[in-house]
Each structure stands twice: as structure tokens, then as C-alpha cells.
Amino acid sequence: MCYGGTAMMAFADIKEALTPKPSAQLYDVPLLYCMLMLMGVGFVMVTSASMPTADRLFGNIYHFTIRHGIFLALSFCLFWITTSVPMSWWKKANPYLLLVGLGLLLIVLIVGREVNGSTRWIPIGPFNIQASELAKLFFFSYISGYLVRKRSEVQENIKGFIKPILVFAAYAGLILMQPDLGTVVVMFVTTVGLLFLAGAKLWQFFVLILTGVALVIGLIVLEPYRMARVIGFLEPWDDPFGKGYQLVQSLMAYSQGDWFGQGLGNSVQKLQYLPEAHTDFIFAVIAEELGFVGVSSILIVLGTLVFRALLIGQNALKNGKEYEGYLALAIGIWFAFQTMVNVGASAGILPTKGLTLPFISYGGSSLLMMTIAAGILLRVDFETKMATKQATSGGAKR
């Protein structure tokens, strides 16, 4: 019995040693903890914020909770898979992923499901996939690869600077046809940030920003519903039951939060007063129920996650992993800007854009793609640390 038990233990040790899996110590543990905390908070707050709407629409207060739970389970599976995929695969596949993204954006215009006047979702059984969320990550992957292949051209030749802008314009045109200006703005800011970090000339950088701002203003002025949003943002109290209704209700939620909030589940504004309480305006419900302390804590966690993403990108670039570094930086900029827009819109600092709060808002496609992005960050960090470790051990042997 003793020999048998010893043999089994030895076999288990050998099997574990031979299994090719990354060491937990080589992962960015703070980033992983931040993601898990945000997902946990998101599940609780989606449950709290969605109950009145779920009861009214479906007669089941846990309708959105169940769906969010399913997407969380899928997210964990995709996260685990992503951390196991070598970054070399993403690097080789990024041109094809760009084409897949374009295909999805075309498909959604043909067979997409319309919700609140926007055709952004491809119906797949009981679920809807938001094409622009997938296209966003695929585009960032392509731009990162382009900057590696054409970095000197981007720095020295105007053609190298314009080429990625043309690709962005093709994506932006299809996304605006849905319409979805918020996603286009996120992609634009991230693209500008990457081009700047890649060493584009300063005058090109400023021209691009001014052009982008002018185009956004033009798109707002030409679309009455966007103009109405801006007017509602600038003067919400002039029309508190019309153009300014959503922002007024959101600000009322903030005002009732105080230091420690009304308590979990005790929000008044989510009771059919605040539209999109569990999606775009979930941060207002968090402010009302958890107060200043809760809001500040979540922002600290989100800020830490963004900081870790940017640090991972910086370390990758220092170690000669340019594609991995640019992609990690793109993800960090994406998370940071989307957080700023979501929080700013709910607090009346920015016009509403219909963007989710990373890892917290209800929205399956957003959650899935952001979790995949977090998995990429951990994989980049793992490969960078492994390369450094191997270089160190190789130098020590010599």
C-alpha cells in the first residue's frame, strides 16, 4: 500500500511537472485581482440595478442576473484560453482578424437586430453579439502589428502615418452606419495614442486630433438625436422631463449617495426612474447605493488595472516585444478612456455615449471582449517575464 501510494504521488508530480502551463508567479497578480474584483462588483450591482426593469419586462427579477452570470462563466473560459494562446498567434493572425472584424461590421448591417434605433447586434440564438466590440479588439491588434512592421515609415513618412488612419476610417464608417459614435471615439483616441507612442511627428499628431474633433462635432450637429443629447448635457435642468431627463435622474442618484450610500439594493432611481440603470448608467446606481466611499474604491481598482496594463506594455517594449507592448498599451488606453467616458457621462461631465463601464456594466459582448483583452495582458506579461528569466539564466550560465 505504501509503495503504491508513493508511486501514485510520484506519477502525479511528474505529470504536473510535464504539463506546459505558465507559473502563477509569472502572471501579473494585481491585474488579475483587479479584474476579479470588478467582475464580482459588476455581478452584484447588475443584480441590484436590473431587478425593477427585469420584473417589468420579463416578470422575473433575476432575468438579467442569470444572463450576466452565463456571460461571466463564458468570460472565465475565454480568459483561461486566452492566457494559454501564444502572442505569436495573435501577431500572425492580426491581418485576418482585421478582415473578420470588417465582415462582422458588414453582417450586422444586413441581419443585425435593432434596439433603441441602433442596429449593433447579431442575433445568435437567445443571445446578441455586438459586432463593434469584437471589431474593436481586432482593430487594435492590427494597428499594433502595423506599427511593428512600419514603425520607421510612421516616424519618417506621411504615408506610413496615413495608412492606419485609412483602415480606421473604413471601420469607423461601418460603425457609424449602425450608428455607434461612442465606439468610434474610443477607437480614434486609442489609435491616436498608439501613433504618438510609436513616434509619429508632433504636427501630424495635432492635425489628427483637430481633424477628429472637427469630424465628431460635425457628426453631432448633423444628427438631431446627438444634438439633443448635447443640449440635454449642457442644460439638463431646462428640460428635466425631456432632453435632460436621463442626466437629471443620474445626478439625483449621485446626490443621494452621500459618503456611504443608501445601502446595497436601496437605490430609488433604479425603480423605473433612471433609464439604462444596469448598463450605461450603472455607476450612478453604485454612487447612490455605495456612496462616495464605494465609488472611490471602484475607481481606484479601475485605475490600478489601467496602470498595470500600461506598465505591462512598457515592460514589453523595453524587452524588445514591440507588438505585445503596443497591444498592451492599446488595451490600457481603451480601458482608461472608456471608463472616463462612462463615469463622466453619468456624472454630467461628458455627454452620454452609450459605453459600458469595464467589467461592471451589463453587456455580454463587452464583458467577453474585455476579459479576452485582460487575458492578453496577462499573457504578454508572462511572455515578457519568461524572456527576461531565460535571458538572465542564460547569462548566468555563460
Swiss-Prot record:
<dbReference type="GO" id="GO:0005886">
    <property type="term" value="C:plasma membrane"/>
</dbReference>
<feature type="transmembrane region" description="Helical">
    <location>
        <begin position="180"/>
        <end position="200"/>
    </location>
</feature>
<dbReference type="GO" id="GO:0043093">
    <property type="term" value="P:FtsZ-dependent cytokinesis"/>
</dbReference>
<feature type="topological domain" description="Cytoplasmic">
    <location>
        <begin position="1"/>
        <end position="25"/>
    </location>
</feature>
<feature type="topological domain" description="Periplasmic">
    <location>
        <begin position="178"/>
        <end position="179"/>
    </location>
</feature>
<dbReference type="GO" id="GO:0015648">
    <property type="term" value="F:lipid-linked peptidoglycan transporter activity"/>
</dbReference>
<feature type="topological domain" description="Periplasmic">
    <location>
        <begin position="346"/>
        <end position="356"/>
    </location>
</feature>
<keyword id="KW-1133">Transmembrane helix</keyword>
<dbReference type="GO" id="GO:0008955">
    <property type="term" value="F:peptidoglycan glycosyltransferase activity"/>
</dbReference>
<keyword id="KW-0997">Cell inner membrane</keyword>
<keyword id="KW-0961">Cell wall biogenesis/degradation</keyword>
<feature type="transmembrane region" description="Helical">
    <location>
        <begin position="157"/>
        <end position="177"/>
    </location>
</feature>
<protein>
    <recommendedName>
        <fullName>Probable peptidoglycan glycosyltransferase FtsW</fullName>
        <ecNumber>2.4.99.28</ecNumber>
    </recommendedName>
</protein>
<keyword id="KW-0328">Glycosyltransferase</keyword>
<keyword id="KW-0132">Cell division</keyword>
<dbReference type="Pfam" id="PF01098">
    <property type="entry name" value="FTSW_RODA_SPOVE"/>
</dbReference>
<keyword id="KW-0812">Transmembrane</keyword>
<feature type="transmembrane region" description="Helical">
    <location>
        <begin position="92"/>
        <end position="112"/>
    </location>
</feature>
<feature type="topological domain" description="Cytoplasmic">
    <location>
        <begin position="378"/>
        <end position="398"/>
    </location>
</feature>
<dbReference type="GO" id="GO:0032153">
    <property type="term" value="C:cell division site"/>
</dbReference>
<keyword id="KW-0573">Peptidoglycan synthesis</keyword>
<feature type="transmembrane region" description="Helical">
    <location>
        <begin position="357"/>
        <end position="377"/>
    </location>
</feature>
<dbReference type="InterPro" id="IPR018365">
    <property type="entry name" value="Cell_cycle_FtsW-rel_CS"/>
</dbReference>
<dbReference type="InterPro" id="IPR013437">
    <property type="entry name" value="FtsW"/>
</dbReference>
<feature type="transmembrane region" description="Helical">
    <location>
        <begin position="26"/>
        <end position="46"/>
    </location>
</feature>
<dbReference type="GO" id="GO:0008360">
    <property type="term" value="P:regulation of cell shape"/>
</dbReference>
<keyword id="KW-0133">Cell shape</keyword>
<feature type="topological domain" description="Periplasmic">
    <location>
        <begin position="47"/>
        <end position="69"/>
    </location>
</feature>
<keyword id="KW-0131">Cell cycle</keyword>
<feature type="topological domain" description="Periplasmic">
    <location>
        <begin position="223"/>
        <end position="289"/>
    </location>
</feature>
<comment type="similarity">
    <text>Belongs to the SEDS family. FtsW subfamily.</text>
</comment>
<feature type="topological domain" description="Cytoplasmic">
    <location>
        <position position="91"/>
    </location>
</feature>
<keyword id="KW-0472">Membrane</keyword>
<feature type="transmembrane region" description="Helical">
    <location>
        <begin position="70"/>
        <end position="90"/>
    </location>
</feature>
<feature type="topological domain" description="Periplasmic">
    <location>
        <begin position="113"/>
        <end position="120"/>
    </location>
</feature>
<feature type="topological domain" description="Cytoplasmic">
    <location>
        <begin position="142"/>
        <end position="156"/>
    </location>
</feature>
<feature type="transmembrane region" description="Helical">
    <location>
        <begin position="121"/>
        <end position="141"/>
    </location>
</feature>
<keyword id="KW-1003">Cell membrane</keyword>
<dbReference type="GO" id="GO:0071555">
    <property type="term" value="P:cell wall organization"/>
</dbReference>
<feature type="transmembrane region" description="Helical">
    <location>
        <begin position="325"/>
        <end position="345"/>
    </location>
</feature>
<comment type="pathway">
    <text>Cell wall biogenesis; peptidoglycan biosynthesis.</text>
</comment>
<feature type="transmembrane region" description="Helical">
    <location>
        <begin position="290"/>
        <end position="312"/>
    </location>
</feature>
